[in-house]
Amino acid sequence: MSKLGDYAAVKKDILAVLKQPEYDDGSAGPVLVRLAWHASGTYCARTDTGGSNGAGMRYEAEGGDPANAGLQHARVFLEPIKEKHSWITYADLWTLAGVVAIEAMGGPSIQWKPGRTDFADDSRLPPRGRLPDGAQGADHLRFIFNRMGFNDQEIVALSGAHNLGRCHSDRSGFEGPWVNSPTRFSNQYYKLLLKLKWQPKKWDGPFQYVAKAPGADDDDEQLMMLPTDYALIQDEKMRPWVEKYAEDRDAFFNDFAKVFAKLIELGVYRDESGIARADKMKQFKGEYKSAPQKSPVPGAPGAGKDGEANPLARQNERAHGQAQHALAKL
């Protein structure tokens, strides 16, 4: 066991678990980034609930959310580290692992602060349905990310995390990698999004786009893009950022480092010593419905058609109002 606060020792052990020959593309890195992302991406600025504090995925209500399918692998990879360094909280370990993995895979150095606490029970968990649904369009992206406090530029920058990893049909329903080198952080995601001729995938699964990788043989695995990825180049306000990041790797790395650091601080309330206070976090009270789920039919509700989330946005407005009214009485 390391000394209390010896984060260098924790980082060293995180680096040691990244190589996983039997796992996706031989690396645990991408799934650790996804764990940090999903642990943080439940934040709602309107109700001031959710976020990276608490490590709620330890409980079924959050860990069993279909949007978090497959993240049990990331948690299993990190469990020996938690056992060895028992003083670190899960909330800190999960976010630190994402930051360490990004840099180890060639990405930028990202600011990370310790001090998050773990929930003692599941009473403060955010509702399901707050994470992005890859089958949607630009309106859904804004609905989800604006709720957390992100603008269009930050949405496009955070989408660059799709430089890493792959989709699995038994988890998200989608299948395939976004880029040629899914364990190397780069701006290739944006370049391929603009360069390749993306076509609807012919299969029985949810609607997604596929294209032949540059230099690939006909029988090689195809690259893929989600409807939310393709929406970035269809939307007139988001596309310029895709073009900028495709052209300027350094600009992307710089912006990604800033926005990922912002993401993993969402919902963290620190006292003067820097320790996050779980007792300052608010409980969500009220109903929250998720956006439409995946559809195999292009253009159908749930397949990425603009405007589809508007009715659900109105429902959530009412839910937010109810939640704020309840919180005002606390």
From Swiss-Prot:
One of its GO terms (biological process) is cellular response to oxidative stress. It comes from the Eukaryota. PROSITE patterns: PEROXIDASE_2, PEROXIDASE_4. Heme b binds at residue 162. Binds 1 heme b (iron(II)-protoporphyrin IX) group per subunit. Residues 286-330 are annotated as: Disordered. The active site is at 38 (proton acceptor), 178 (tryptophan radical intermediate). SUPFAM superfamilies: Heme-dependent peroxidases (SSF48113). The record marks 34 as: Transition state stabilizer. GO terms for molecular function: heme binding; metal ion binding; peroxidase activity. PANTHER family: L-ASCORBATE PEROXIDASE 3, THYLAKOID LUMENAL 29 KDA PROTEIN, CHLOROPLASTIC-RELATED. Destroys radicals which are normally produced within the cells and which are toxic to biological systems. This is Putative heme-binding peroxidase. It comes from Mycosarcoma maydis (Corn smut fungus). The lineage of its organism: Eukaryota, Fungi, Dikarya, Basidiomycota, Ustilaginomycotina. The gene is CCP2.
